[in-house]
């Protein structure tokens, strides 16, 4: 091939490449002009046709909470409603809210230019919600009327440009956000507790005029008794203290002399086994102190004793929640559930005269190895079910929580560990329903390696590390307390919360403080403005720690750290965002 033919071929190839580049540039420019036109049209429509008067501006949830409004509760109820009307608002679109990553743009041509398909809107709001989670102001700043719709518009069209300017492979990598790794827990500083932990356990906020009610009666396992019953919003385990305020007439007629009254408390949240759906599980409680409140109510302190089960057919009347000032009595037959405990396998091996070496610390390991050599059981199996090894591992895990009241009785220890190790709700139900102490301890042992967080129950924002729990009461890190209105709060004490996790409501106060010498201040989830607990700050100079937090069990849940991703918001948050936008655009 000569030089002239070669140059002619190269010239033709160069012209082809120029034509392809020109066509690509024209197509790219057309896409950009189309997106810009849609953006400008929607912006003009919002500004010219849909601008609400200033008095209809979005309100700050924190401000609403401070005014005593019920907006957060309304948001929760609204979020629990069905979305079908919202999803079907644009019949010409086949893209639902459940497919935010769809790349089908065919509907964009059929819809008016200022209308955006729901899946595009959902994707933009989802991204904004995830970004607001880690910023100051949280959802309150996100709902700022001055720039809310503008930010939604910008997010929608920035995502649209990203889809149109990249290839299919690159777009897939761009749209799919990598999962955030679990948050690394900051190093825990040493905690110095200069506070009498007996005071919260005594519930001294009730006053000093309470009188002792003697008598602690354990009922025979398997026996059936007729007693007064109430309901409770939290799960109580035997050994826990339940303080409450109630009309004294509910108990006085049934108070048998000097013996403490025993009554039953059922837990509606305790899901019964599938084969026993018509049963209510709970505990017996015995009153051990009482005193007048001065407002027609009586303070009572009671302690949970034994697990019980109630058949629905045996309930006489309508049971009421003990924390909601019940006005009528309800009685039922209750059955006392058993607690089975089997000693360690090696304890059943009779070593004769050598048994004296078992209690000598220097000979204990040698004695154990000799025992193992006389049995057919592998050493790993014996170690797996060793009660002593579970106790030691639990002691090491709780060492940083400043707890020195671990019981020695296996039955009491199994319930005590459930309260202080903070298991998930599913695990708590499993441990409560089992009659075997050994099985309960094995379930608890399976959670020793879990890294857990406290999450807001309403929006799933992470609030605190479970490893930051510590005991401000001799009963442990989780205790039931009663507020002045009679509502019972399950409170978990932590010495710190995550940055940008909380806001405040109202003013601090020292009245009816559960921790004498500390003032309390209501804290809210900074993302959804729901009440999640209290901040306690020392008002006396000699108390330590100076600041700690109490998380309300009804407002938080416990989950694994791996759940804490950037897109872990509750669906109702995004759904309500979409409804707000839709209302503004109608």
Curated annotation (Swiss-Prot):
**Keyword Amino-acid biosynthesis appears in the UniProt entry:** no
Q: Which stretches are tagged as biased composition: Pro residues?
A: 180-190
Would you say which domain of life the source belongs to? Answer: Eukaryota
Residues binding Zn(2+), per UniProt:
456, 459, 525, 528
User: What is the protein's quaternary organization?
Assistant: Likely a component of a DCX (DDB1-CUL4-X-box) protein ligase complex. May interact with pic/DDB1.
What subcellular locations does the record give? Nucleus
MF GO annotations: metal ion binding
Species annotation:
Drosophila erecta
**Which GO terms fall under biological process for this protein?**
positive regulation of neuromuscular synaptic transmission; positive regulation of Wnt signaling pathway; protein ubiquitination
**Principal subcellular localization:** nucleus
> Could you tell me where the Polar residues compositional bias lies?
86-96
Annotated Lon N-terminal domain residues: 226-452
Family the entry assigns: Belongs to the CRBN family.
Q: Which UniProt keywords apply?
A: Metal-binding, Nucleus, Ubl conjugation, Ubl conjugation pathway, Zinc
What does the protein in this record do? Substrate recognition component of a DCX (DDB1-CUL4-X-box) E3 protein ligase complex that mediates the ubiquitination and subsequent proteasomal degradation of target proteins. Has an essential role in mediating growth by negatively regulating insulin signaling. It also has a role in maintaining presynaptic function in the neuromuscular junction synapses of third-instar larvae.
Instruction: Give the gene name.
Output: ohgt
| Region Disordered, annotated ranges | 1-114, 158-194
InterPro entries per record: CULT, Lon_prtase_N, Yippee/Mis18/Cereblon
The protein depicted here goes by the name Protein cereblon
Pathway assigned to this chain's UniProt record: Protein modification; protein ubiquitination
Enumerate composition-biased segments (Acidic residues).
Answer: 75-85, 170-179
What does the PTM comment of the record read?
Ubiquitinated.
Q: Does the keyword Zinc apply?
A: yes
Q: GO cellular component terms?
A: nucleus
Q: Where is the composition biased (Basic and acidic residues)?
A: 14-37, 159-168
